[in-house]
């Protein structure tokens, strides 16, 4: 019997690009909306508490991404496993994977919360966070990590919905939680005069709301992934498969963020004004990155479902459709962010702030070198998603480790040390994207050519048996 929710989005038939856009646009809107509400933290703090509080929140961003995205990357394993079992019409397998995902996310969330609470200050000190913002950054980070278990449960639940092609409801859930987050930001910062701690508490409360909504959806789900509280447990086989598929994605994210932590440390060497500028520009650029990154998830999900359903003729079309989707989404956003850079940067800091001019000037530098060529990053991620969707979990991680992370670290230790300028630091991003995207593309074409020949050769033998 077919899953009653399997037609949420038909990934196995019809034109590729429109279906990819149908999948990615709500997911992109979800991510951008989440960023919009996260940016509200930064904007409210910058406008009403000054550049020191802005820098304090911003100095934690790469560290938060390092730890949180490492574990969230494992949700890729949930997405691939559930999507492939949907394609194979394995009802029991979808149910077991879904229940295991909820249990695994809670366990990993508690582990990550403990790590964050214990090592927040030592990690910030290792990053050479300026002394005038260290205390506030530590407070923000510890409060943020209290909500991390809810973040993971939400992301694993959303991964189950994405496996069905449902990217609409996560958008609704984040809209609700995001509005609450923005209102609480204003209440805590303006009314209660709690700056850094206030925005952190607001974030945790909004995360709790998003978890409630996604779990409520899964408990009432009318498909194979319907959750029953009594069946939530770690199924050994499913947990191992999720970790085998998702752990490399998590480690890849960690490696990227380790290099970004080193970049943040290099940015810290220029002082609090440049840290604030980097924070504002980074928030602007994250909108483009997140929108493009939705294509990465589409590439994984579409490839996994079609591979499970033996629709091998569609895989190459998914590759080119994913690249086209990146261009359609990424180019306009990058252009808008670059052309209107000064105006967008001015949102994050009060004009009366003594550091206003320096923050705008340094933020524009980052916009030109990082945001303008962001499409390269989007293409790199889409190609990585194709390789991962083919079932190759570790290779994309190794390619990213070599092409992006190590290259960026070596760049900081050599060229940046010799020419200590923001321009020399930021140009390491587009160069690393070009190298890594080219390597992922070569891996995809070589792997798919061999895998397709093997699968098509095995298919007649299976039919005869």
Model-found features: residue ranges?
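Transmembrane helical elements of multi-pass membrane transporters/channels
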Residues: 22-41, 143, 177, 206-210, ...
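Short alpha-helical transmembrane segments in multi-pass integral membrane proteins
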Residues: 1-24, 82-147, 191-247, 303-373, ...
């Amino acid at each position: 019997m077919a899953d009653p929710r399997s037609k949420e989005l038909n990934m196995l038939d019809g034109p590729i690009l429109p279906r990819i856009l149908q999948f990615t646009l709500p997911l992109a809107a979800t991510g951008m909306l989440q960023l919009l509400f996260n940016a509200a933290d930064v904007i409210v703090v910058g406008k009403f508490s000054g550049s020191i509080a802005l820098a304090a929140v911003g100095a934690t961003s790469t560290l938060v991404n390092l730890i949180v995205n490492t574990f969230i990357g494992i949700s890729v394993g949930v997405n691939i496993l559930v999507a492939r079992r949907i394609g194979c019409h394995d009802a029991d397998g979808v149910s077991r994977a879904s229940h295991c995902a909820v249990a695994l996310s809670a366990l990993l969330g508690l582990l990550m919360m403990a790590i964050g609470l214990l090592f927040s200050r030592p990690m910030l000190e290792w990053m050479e966070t300026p002394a005038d913002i260290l205390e506030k950054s530590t407070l923000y980070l510890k409060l943020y990590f209290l909500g991390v278990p809810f973040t993971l449960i939400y992301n694993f639940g959303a991964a189950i919905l994405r496996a069905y092609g449902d990217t609409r409801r996560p958008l609704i859930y984040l809209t609700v939680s995001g509005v609450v987050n923005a209102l609480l930001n204003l209440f805590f910062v303006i009314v209660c005069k709690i700056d850094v701690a206030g925005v952190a508490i607001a974030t945790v409360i909004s995360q709790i709301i998003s978890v409630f909504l996604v779990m409520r959806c899964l408990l009432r789900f009318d498909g194979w992934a319907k959750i029953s509280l009594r069946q939530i447990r770690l199924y050994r086989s499913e947990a191992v498969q999720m970790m085998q598929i998702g752990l490399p994605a998590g480690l890849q994210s960690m490696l990227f963020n380790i290099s970004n932590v080193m970049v943040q440390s290099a940015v810290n060497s220029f002082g609090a004004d440049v840290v604030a500028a980097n924070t504002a520009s980074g928030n602007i650029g994250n909108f483009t990155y997140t929108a493009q990154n939705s294509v990465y998830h589409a590439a994984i999900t579409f490839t996994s479902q079609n591979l499970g359903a033996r629709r091998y003729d569609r895989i190459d079309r998914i590759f080119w459709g994913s690249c086209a989707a990146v261009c359609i989404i990424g180019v306009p956003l990058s252009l808008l962010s670059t052309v209107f850079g000064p105006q967008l940067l001015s949102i994050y800091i009060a004009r009366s702030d003594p550091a206003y001019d320096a923050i705008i000037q340094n933020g524009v530098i980052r916009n030109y070198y990082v945001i303008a060529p962001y499409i390269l990053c989007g293409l790199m991620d889409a190609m990585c998603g194709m390789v991962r969707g083919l079932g190759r979990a570790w290779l994309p991680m190794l390619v990213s480790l070599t092409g992006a992370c190590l290259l960026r670290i070596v760049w900081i230790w050599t060229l940046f040390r010799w020419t200590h300028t923001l321009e020399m630091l930021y140009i390491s991003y587009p160069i690393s994207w070009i190298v890594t995207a080219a390597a992922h593309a070569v891996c995809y074409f070589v792997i798919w050519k061999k895998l397709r020949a093997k699968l098509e050769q095995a298919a007649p033998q299976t039919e005869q048996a």
